[in-house]
Amino acid sequence: MTNRPKLIVTAVALLAMSASLAQSERSDVEDPNEALKIAALEALISAPPERALPLVIKVLDANNTDEVKERALFVLSQIDLPEAQARLLEVARSSDPELSAEAVRMIGIGGNPEALAGLGELYSEGDEDLREAVLEAYMIAGDVDAVHAIATNASDADEFGAAVEMLGVMGAVDRLQALSETSGFTEELIQALGIAGGDNVNATLMTIYRDAETDDIRHAALEGMLISGYDEGVLELYKESTDVNEKRDLLQMLAIMDSDAMMEVIDAALEGGDQ
């Protein structure tokens, strides 16, 4: 009897590989032999795992181009065998920075819990590029806990900023709120909230702006509204402000946001009144 869920997953993976291959053929892959190898790898996605694995490993061990090996890593990420996940981690720990980062991302695509757990050590020992790849892998896999842990244990502002930005991309508003309870609403956290967006976030950004004790935090709240597209909030702040300089800044933000209300506000400002 056909395993329908597995068949669907295989079909989706095959379509993803086909799209990637099509892009490759339009740009990087000029050697017909290389294109044929990539096509052969694509076909392996639908092969039995125990038969596909040794062939993929053979490609990785041979003197192939990075393009071919990257395709092999993708196929490897789709093979649900412990040996495949172990090999992905092995490549991720290799000295080749490009293949290492690609292997990390493929671990994210594969979503294997054991392989994902192995990324923690890689993150701790890796350079900035590898750490970025690990964060991307966690994002692809939807591993909010891992990204939150990185933000919590960050050793500097840059590391913290990268982690909270990824939490914003993942829409993890609750984790961002939790971080604010220990670190306060930093500029990085505020901008990450803007990336996450949503009605609750917009209300939080308004509160942060109104309660801000520094211009930097106030500006970060505005940037958060810009990122989330909350021009209604900026317009509300403009209408309630009595400070000319503040109104000017808010008007400029409305212009940047290309708000529908901008022309009405400009007309009122030129008339010397408020809207």
Question: Which residues fall in each region the model found?
Answer:
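Bacterial N-terminal signal peptides that target proteins for export
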Residues: 2-9
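Positions within the helices of HEAT/ARM-like alpha-solenoid repeats
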Residues: 35-37, 67-69, 98-100, 129-131, ...
